[in-house]
Swiss-Prot record:
HAMAP family in the cross-refs: DnaK (MF_00332)
Region of interest: Disordered: 597-620
Gene name tied to this protein: dnaK
UniProt protein name: Chaperone protein DnaK
Family annotation (InterPro entries): ATPase_NBD, Chaperone_DnaK, Heat_shock_70_CS, HSP70_C_sf, HSP70_peptide-bd_sf, Hsp_70_fam
Family: Belongs to the heat shock protein 70 family.
Keyword DNA-binding attached: no
Length: 620
């Protein structure tokens, strides 16, 4: 086994490191720099440029220069974030089988292919640095990346000729790089604000174990968004002075983007900077120049809501971890955007602790990934990473209920099974709808995929045993299978991400679940009452048909009338829990006479004991 490199495939910049000689080392690229711009360009001569060379020619070739590709990785074309990206990015985003792709000179490229070109350069530069072939890597992703985004990242590695041994979450990787696994037992918060994504993770460390307690974030919040606020401000000022909408000119927009990014960086050390873009555009009166002073105070006011959004996520993640702010012993700052003074000031003020900035925020994630590579190779001993799944996973069961199989916050890798049954007599197949979210009802959660298990042997409802297994691997990628325990027939689905979950949706789901907690509970109670009523009506009708001859006519009619009344109540969509329970109780009382008649009959069948492992929920 050769050397395993750790790669931080970033939105703005990427970095790589290797673990050798009992330490992690950053690998410089061929240009001698520790980070490589995550930019790919296609020239008119047919050349493909990656990194610094692509960045240098971006102003003169904006429509064929691809940056921030991570923002559309695993994104569906019809999502709001895709429409937002279309407005912001100068290159053409197109629909490819429902997912986002880009079009350059009539050819369509997936985000995986573009990312693979970045990874190929990193791989080649690592081989040049190490003097040997590199075929294996650990690649980091934001903790809040969903299943489709993780798969897309792994596919990019495969396209680049890398065997991706592990997909690791960026905050967890950062914790390793800081050596937090070797400290006394502590509660650590990692605040990771990169170029395009934001993560906040609370971990417990000690005794060479790094355990994630809770994680949150936004895959569409980062330095790019801070740049965009400056771009919007400058373009609005320019329009008010000249009447020209500068953002309609892709070449001017690219110059504006570079100027905004540079201004942001300069304001990290200066209180004021000047943006000077001569000949930015022209109209009938001649060329126009953009010259504008931007103060740190103005920049902070333009981006204040973005900073506050990160603070609100800190608050919710600490709450999810079951902790208070005072229990956080250390705050680790990761990502280039944490250099913004106001970001540091707000985080420090909220947590009321000094910030740990001991490692370069642009390099720390790659360093951690290389340490994980060392763990997998066996060079690093006794380090255990325990990450978690950010949302609950389950299936839709009878009545449209979300039945959870793996709860939110479960340590991964994880594998869990539950046994379900059929909802109808002689049901030949079941449909398994895989869901992700925190709401009680299936329709309020995100559908990840659906598959059918065919060939179920004819049997009364509730008799077949269908074992559904959820398996999340160490990369956070999900496989769901279903098996008929009687026939042995099985079916499985690897969640393809065709309806992948965006991180903003995850955040919204958690908030919606909290807002609708009581309402959802009431709805679930009604559904459970209806399911119980339906089961009793079905079983009583079946028993009545078999043993009617053992009853007098009045008793038989009384039971049948009670069954009919309960069925009418079940069919009424507006029936309340109380109404369903009342009708169920009346039928149960009427059916006592049927039970007595069955007991008195010598050949009465004893009710079959229900399998303790069978979950009292049915799949349709």
């Amino acid at each position: 086994m050769g050397k395993v490199i750790g790669i931080d495939l970033g939105t703005t910049n990427s970095a790589m490191a290797v673990y050798e000689g009992n330490e992690a080392k950053i690998i410089a690229n061929k240009e001698g720099k520790n980070t490589t711009p995550s930019i790919v360009a296609f020239t008119d001569k047919g050349e493909i440029l990656v990194g610094e060379s692509a960045k240098r020619q971006a102003v003169t070739n904006p429509e064929k220069t691809i940056y921030s590709i991570k923002r559309i990785m695993g994104l569906m074309f019809n999502e709001d974030k895709a429409k937002e990206a279309e407005k912001r990015l100068p290159y053409k985003i197109v629909d490819r089988n429902g997912a986002c792709a880009i079009e350059i000179s009539g050819k369509v490229y997936t985000p995986q292919e573009i990312s693979a070109k970045i990874l190929m350069k990193l791989k080649e530069d690592a081989e040049s640095y190490l003097g040997e072939s590199v075929t294996e890597a650990v690649i980091t992703v934001p903790a809040y990346f969903n299943d489709s985004q993780r798969k897309a990242t792994k596919e990019a590695g495969t396209i680049a000729g890398l065997n991706v041994l592990r997909i690791i979450n960026e905050p967890t990787s950062a914790a390793l790089a800081y050596g937090l696994d070797k400290k006394e037992s502590e509660k650590i918060m990692v605040y990771d604000l990169g170029g395009g994504t934001f993560d906040v993770t609370v971990l417990e460390t000690g005794d060479n174990v790094v355990e994630v307690l809770a994680t949150g974030g936004d895959a569409f919040l980062g330095g790019d968004d801070f740049d965009n606020r400056v771009i919007d401000f400058l373009s609005a000022e320019f329009k008010s002075e000249t009447g020209i909408e500068i953002k309609n000119d892709v070449m001017a927009l690219q110059r504006l983007k570079e100027a905004a990014e540079n201004a942001k960086k300069e304001l990290s050390s200066a209180m004021e900077t000047e943006i000077n873009l001569p000949f930015i555009t022209a109209d009938a009166t001649g060329p126009k120049h953009l010259v504008k002073k931007l103060t740190r105070a103005k920049f902070e006011s333009l981006t204040e809501d973005l900073m506050e959004e990160t603070i609100s996520k800190i608050e919710s993640v600490i709450k999810d971890a079951g902790l208070t702010k005072n229990e956080i012993s250390e705050v680790v700052m990761v990502g280039g955007s944490t250099r913004i003074p106001k970001v540091q000031e707000r985080v420090k003020a909220f947590i009321n602790k000094d910030l740990n900035k001991s490692v370069n925020p642009d390099e720390v994630v790659a360093v951690g990934a290389s340490i994980q590579g060392g763990v997998l190779k066996g060079d690093v001993k006794d380090v255990l990473l325990l990450d978690v799944t950010p949302l609950s996973l389950g299936i839709e069961t009878l009545g449209g209920v979300m039945t959870k199989v793996i709860d939110r916050g479960t340590t991964i890798p994880a594998k869990k099974s539950q046994v379900f049954s059929t909802a109808e007599d002689n049901q030949p197949a079941v449909s398994i709808m895989v869901l992700q979210g925190e709401r009680e009802l299936a329709r309020d959660n995100k559908s990840l995929g659906k598959f059918d298990l065919q060939g179920i042997a004819p049997a009364p409802r509730g008799v077949p045993q269908i074992e559904v297994t959820f398996d999340i691997d160490a990369n956070g990628i999900l496989t769901v299978s279903a098996q008929d325990k009687n026939t042995g027939k099985s079916q499985e689905i690897k969640i393809s991400g065709s309806s992948g979950l965006s991180d903003s949706e995850i955040e919204k789901m958690v908030k919606d679940a909290e807002l609708h907690k009581e309402e959802d509970a009431r709805k679930k109670e009604v559904i459970e009452a209806r399911n119980h009523a339906d089961s009793l009506a079905h079983q009583t009708q079946k028993s009545l048909d078999e043993h009617k001859t053992n009853l007098n006519e009045n008793d038989a009619n009384e039971i049948q009338n009670a069954i009919n009344a309960l069925k009418d109540c079940i069919k009424n969509d507006n029936a309340t829990k109380a109404e369903l329970e009342d009708k169920t109780k009346l039928l149960a009382q009427a059916a006592q006479k049927l039970g007595e008649a069955m007991a008195n009959k010598n050949n009465a069948e004893q009710p079959k004991k229900k399998d303790d492992d069978v979950i009292d929920a049915e799949v349709e």
